[in-house]
């Protein structure tokens, strides 16, 4: 078998924007930041919530506003 072909595995802490932290094994690094996790995602919480943190809806409306004029 070949030696040293497997990625390094870290004990990582995943930190959500809501403040929730989870300890997992990861090959990405020791600290991973995410915007949404199971503690705050509407599917897991059962609560309807607006999740546009990156301004995607505003960008879409601005881009296609010229077609709405007609």
UniProtKB/Swiss-Prot annotation:
Any single GO CC term annotated in Swiss-Prot or TrEMBL for this entry: ribonucleoprotein complex
Classification via Pfam families: Ribosomal_L31 (PF01197)
Sections of the chain in a coiled coil: none
Keyword Metal-binding: yes
Record flagged with keyword Protein biosynthesis: no
Superkingdom of origin organism: Bacteria
Keywords, ordered alphabetically: Metal-binding, Ribonucleoprotein, Ribosomal protein, RNA-binding, rRNA-binding, Zinc
Cofactor remark: Binds 1 zinc ion per subunit.
Example of a GO biological process term: translation
UniProt similarity note: Belongs to the bacterial ribosomal protein bL31 family. Type A subfamily.
General function of this protein: Binds the 23S rRNA.
Protein name: Large ribosomal subunit protein bL31
